[in-house]
Amino acid sequence: MPFSLGQRWISDTESELGLGTVIGLEGRMVTLMFPATDENRMFARDDAPLTRVIYNPGDIIESHEGWSLKVSEIEEKNQLVIYHGIHTETGEEVSLRETLLNHNIRFNKPQDRLFAGQIDRLDRFGVRYQSQLLRHKLATSDLLGLQGPRVGLIPHQQWIAHEVGQRFAPRVLLADEVGLGKTIEAGLIIHQQLLTGRAERILIIVPDTLRHQWLVEMLRRFNLRFSVFDEDRCVEAYADHDNPFYTEQLVICSLELLRKKKRLDQALDADWDLMVVDEAHHLEWTEEEPSRAYRVVEALSEVVPGVLLLTATPDQLGHQSHFARLRLLDPDRFYDYQAFLKEEESYKEVASAADALASGKRLPDEAVASLTELLNEKDITPALRLIEDESVDNEQRDQARSELLQELLDRHGTGRVLYRNSRASVKGFPTRIFNAHPQTMPAQYKTAARVSDMMGGQTDLTAKVKQALSPEKLYQAFESDSASWWKFDPRVDWLIDFLKNHRSKKVLIIASQAETALSLEEALRTREGIQATVFHEGMSIIERDKAGAYFAQESGGAQALICSEIGSEGRNFQFASHLVLFDLPLNPDLLEQRIGRLDRIGQANDVEIHLPYLANTAQENLMNWYHKGLNAFEQTCPTGHILFNEFSEELLTQLVYRDEDKFTQLLNHTQSRYKALKKAMEQGRDKLLEINSHGGDKAQKLVENLAARDQDTQLIGSVIRLWDIIGVEQEDSGENAIVLHPSEHMMFPTYPGLPEDGITVTFDREMALSRDDIALITQEHPLVQTGLDLITSSETGTTSVAVLKNKALPAGTIFLELIYMADASAPRSSQLYRYMPPTPVRVLLDKNGNNLSQNVSYESFDKQLSAVNRHIASKLVNASQTLLHPLFAKGEEFAQAAMKQLTEEASNKMTQQLTAELERLEALKAVNPNIRDEELEHLRNQMVELGNYLDACQLQLDAVRLVLVSHA
C-alpha cells in the first residue's frame, strides 16, 4: 500500500477509532494517530487492515472546525488530497485539505461504509434484507394484532377482535355468556389497537380483587406490560410527574381508587385513547339517581375516545341495566329509556326476519313482507326469488340468504355496539358429566359439631352454613395441630383411591380455602406418594406458573393440581378432563367458575365432574339444590345468581336445619322458576345479534387463515437465523420448545425482553397454551420485533462482498445488489402502514447498469454466493471503485421508478378502500343511527392525510452487496 504522511485512513477492524492520520513511516511499518480517541496504532505496510478514505464529487464532508462543503472537484498533490467545493452555509467556493477533515467521522451510508472498507459478513446482509421483508409482511398483514397473543384460535373471539379492533376509537359492549372469553376478546382488541397505532394510552378499570388477574393475563397472553396503580403507587409517581397517570402508558386500577375526586380528576386529565371497564354490570343506574361508580365511569367515557365495557349478558340483568351500559357508550344515541324500549320493539321484527333467513327453510309470507319493508330502499326481489327457487343450487340460495342477512345486520339497532355470544350459538363445548360420591359422616366431625353447639357456637346464619359445609375446619379449630382431619376424612380416602385408579389421567382438584388445598397435598404425598402440586393465592405469580407447568408436563409431571378458590381464578387447564370438587362454594357463579377451568372451548374430552360429599349433611342439600334445582353441574346456568338471590334465605335455612319436606318444596319452587327463566331467555334470544357476534363462516375463515400463519416454516427459519446473528444462545429443551439465553458474544450489549436467566419459547400454539411458562413466538412477539429493530436500526448487514463461482460468466464480472427502503414516514396512528409501510426495493445491476432483479430472484442468487474475508473484500472494492460510482446513480434511477409505482398503487388502494367504507357508512347512517359522525369525519380526514404522506415518500439506500465472478 502506498502510504504518505498526512493521509487519512480508517481501520477495517476498529472503525470506532474514527479517522486516522499517517504520522510515521519506518521500514515495513506505518503508524497512524486516531485523534478522536487519542490513540496510536502501528501496522505492517504490506497487509494492514486499513482503507484509504477519499470522498467523491457530490459528497458532503466536514472540517475539524465544524463547517461543511459539498465536493465538486478532487485534486491530488504530493500523494495528499485537496477537496474543492461549495460551503454548505455561505455558498462560497472553498477548499479543504484531507489533513483537516473531522476526526470523528462515521460512515452511515452503505456506499460510504463499503468504500471505507467497513464490510460486513455475507450472512448478515441476508438477515438484514429478510428482516426488512418480515417487517413489511407484518405491517401489511390483514391479521395484524391477532396472531401474536397466546390464545386459542376460537372463531367468535377472533371475529369480535377483528371487527372491533380495526375501528377508530371503538365504543362497544362485550356481553358474552360466562366461559366464552370476554377478557380474551378485550385483550385481543387492546393488542390490535396498540399494534396498529390506533391507541397508545390505555386504562383498564376492574374490581379490586381482579387487578392482578388482569395484570397477569395481559402479560402472559398478550405480552403487554401494564402497571397496577393504587394509592401508594400514585403517591410514589409524584416524583416523576404531577399527574401520576402520565408516568405509564398502560394502566390497571380499581374503581375504588377513582372514587376519590383527586384521582378521578387526574385520570380525566390523562389523555387516554381507550378505556376498558370489567364487571360493568355492577355499575348501578336509575334515571333519578345514578350510583357514584356509574358517574365515575360516565365522566371518563365523556373524555376517552374508545370504550370497552365487559358485562354479564343483558338477559341476566334486565332492560334498564342494559340501557345504562349503552348510554355510557353513546349518550346522544341512547338518551331516554322509554324511547329505547319503543325502539327495541322494532328490533323484534328485524330479529324475526333474521330467524327466518337463518333457518334455511322456506320463507313464510310474513317474513317476505317484513324483509321487503325493512329493506325498502333497495330492490330485494331478485334475492327473494333465488331463495324460493328450488331449481337453483344450494350454494346460490345460501349466498342470497347471506347477503340479505348482512343487510339486516347493518340495520340492526345495536349491532355495532353490542356483541353477545351464548353457548347455544357457539359450537365446540364439551359434554359435562356429573358424578356424586356419597361418604359417611365421621364421628369426629359429629362430636366437634355437638361441642360447638354446647358452647354456643355461631349465631349468624351464613356463618353456621359455612361451618356446616366445612366440618373439617371446625374440627381442626378444636384440635389445633394435635390432629389432622385428613387422616380420617372419607372424602380423602375416596380421593386417594380415585387417583390410584386413574393414574394416567390429569386431575384438577378445587377446594374453597388455601389451607384445605395444602392439607390435601400433604395427605396425598404422605399417605400414598402421589405426585400433586398446589395452587393458591398465597403463592407468587412465578410460583403459580411453575405449579401449572409441573401439572401440564406430560411425562414426569404432577398427576393432580390442588387449587384454592381464589388461586384458580383466571387459570384454565383444558388438557385435563377430570375435575374433583372437594367442597362446594355457596354461590352458583363460583361453581360455574370452577367448572369453567376445564369446560372451555378447546376442551377435547367430556368433562367428568366428581363430588365426594358427606351424606345426610348440608353438603348433600347444597349439591341437590345445584343439581336438581339448577342443573348447574351439567349445564351452564346464566340465571343462577338470580335464583340464588330469590331463594337464598330458604336455602341457607335448609342447609343448617334440614327439614326434608321443606327442602323438597324449595327444590320444586326452584325448578319451576329455573324453567320459566330459561324459557324466557330462550324466547328472548336475538338470533341476528348472535349471527353478528359469532361471525359464522367469516369467523371460521379468519381462524383458518390464522392457523395457516402458525404453520409458516419460513418464519421459523428467519427468526432462528435472526437470533443466531444477534448471538442469542439457543438450547433445544424437547417438546417443541427452545430455551433462549443472552450470551457473552452478543452483537448488541442488551436485548430488551430477553431475561438474564433466559426464557423458554415455542412456535407451537398448542404447546404454549398448555404451558404458562412457555412463550409463544410469532412475528408479533416482542422478542421478534425487538430483534428485527436491533438489526434494521443498526449498521448490521448494510455492506457485503461475495464471490459468485460460475464458469458461464467471464471471470471478474461484477454485479451490484442494492436494497433501498421506500418510506413515507408518518405517525403510526395515521394507518399509513396498511397501504405503504417501509418497503424494501431490490435492484440488481450488471456492469452495464442493466437491472436484473425481475429475472434473478434474491433466493436463487444468494444460494450461489460464497463469502470472502474482510481484507480481500476491501481490496476488491478498491479495485472496482471506478465501475461502481456510476452504478450507484443508475440504481437510484431504477429504485425511484419502483417507488413511484409503489406509491401510486398504495394511493389507489387507499382511495378505493376508504371511499368504499365511507360510502357504506354514509348509506348505513340513513337507516342505522349507531354510525357515529366521528367515524365518518375520521375517514374523510384520513384520506387527505394519507395522500399528503404518500406524496412525501422518500427513498434511502439500506444495504449494498458487491458480487464478483470467480473461476477459482
From Swiss-Prot:
Keyword Hydrolase in annotation: yes
- Enzyme superclass (EC): hydrolase
A single MF term (Gene Ontology): ATP binding
Q: EC no.? A: 3.6.4.-
The portions of this protein that span the membrane are: none
Matching entries from PROSITE patterns are given as: HELICASE_ATP_BIND_1, HELICASE_CTER
Gene3D superfamilies assigned to the protein according to its UniProt record, in alphabetical order: 2.30.30.140, 2.30.30.930, 3.30.360.80, 6.10.140.1500, 6.10.140.2230, P-loop containing nucleotide triphosphate hydrolases (3.40.50.300), Tandem AAA-ATPase domain (3.40.50.10810)
Q: Write out the GO biological process terms.
A: regulation of DNA-templated transcription
Renumbered to this chain, motif DEAH box spans 278-281
Task: List residues binding ATP.
Answer: 176-183
Helicase ATP-binding domain span = 163-332
InterPro entries in UniProt: Helicase_ATP-bd, Helicase_C-like, Helicase_RapA, P-loop_NTPase, RapA_C, SNF2-like_sf, SNF2/RAD54-like_C, SNF2_N
Q: Which SUPFAM superfamilies match?
A: P-loop containing nucleoside triphosphate hydrolases
User: Which Pfam families does the record match to this protein?
Assistant: Helicase_C, RapA_C, SNF2-rel_dom, Tudor_1_RapA, Tudor_RapA
Q: Where is the Helicase C-terminal domain?
A: 491-645
Q: Which SMART domains match?
A: DEXDc, HELICc
Give the keywords, sorted. Activator, ATP-binding, DNA-binding, Helicase, Hydrolase, Nucleotide-binding, Transcription, Transcription regulation
Q: What does this protein do?
A: Transcription regulator that activates transcription by stimulating RNA polymerase (RNAP) recycling in case of stress conditions such as supercoiled DNA or high salt concentrations. Probably acts by releasing the RNAP, when it is trapped or immobilized on tightly supercoiled DNA. Does not activate transcription on linear DNA. Probably not involved in DNA repair.
| Similarity comment | Belongs to the SNF2/RAD54 helicase family. RapA subfamily.
Subunit details: Interacts with the RNAP. Has a higher affinity for the core RNAP than for the holoenzyme. Its ATPase activity is stimulated by binding to RNAP.
The protein's name: RNA polymerase-associated protein RapA
Q: What's the gene?
A: rapA
